[in-house]
């Protein structure tokens, strides 16, 4: 399998080491057809985008600049903020790709949610929070499932299947096992392979994720951004 698109990459707008243009040029050099920039949303205390208007504007400009060479997707990596499924999607911006994950440095909705998502090991509650977020919001991709907080992969896979959300296989965070992916797949989930690149040189670098997908028994039809 060969990667065709990398939708989860970071730039200097959060904690990446290169600008949007550098990531895009790296994607072109890697032979990708599409590239997404998805920096951390506003309630990530350490790395959240500080000027969302400028961020979105720069991505829209890049989309126009590279038209005809590569498809550029404007993205945002949202934080799961509460057990009720609250997320920090900025209003008034039409992002092409919305990615959702649990991040330890997020500004959570309340103490109960912070405790559960930061320190809790209650798989049922955390999975429920993901499910609520998927039901209430347009979530295109679940980022690094199981990273930072335990989840029920079968239940999450079923929700992804029901709502058209993609289950990410992340090349950077390597806690996901082949059996976890297989469990999500058994519930009808579809998948996306991501580099989660924080430097331009890592854009499209997903060999680990591709090997993991193969070990889980996934076919090309189950992964949206690969081809033969």
Predicted regions: what is each one?
Residues 1-11, 20, 90, 95, ...:
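Charged catalytic cores and adjacent phosphate/nucleic-acid-binding surfaces used
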Residues 14-20, 83-85:
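Glycine-rich anion/phosphate-binding loops
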Residues 15-18, 46-50, 203-205:
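Short, solvent-exposed loop/turn segments at secondary-structure boundaries
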Residues 21-36, 57-68:
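Alpha-helical scaffold segments that flank or form the walls of functional sites
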Residues 34-36, 71-73, 192:
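A structural signal for isolated positions on well-ordered beta-strands in alpha/beta enzyme cores
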Residues 35-46:
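Short, conserved active-site loops that position catalytic residues or coordinate cofactors/metal ions
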Residues 40-41, 103, 172, 197:
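Short, ordered loop/turn segments at secondary-structure junctions
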Residues 45-165, 214-222:
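Extended substrate/RNA-proximal surfaces in nucleic-acid metabolism proteins
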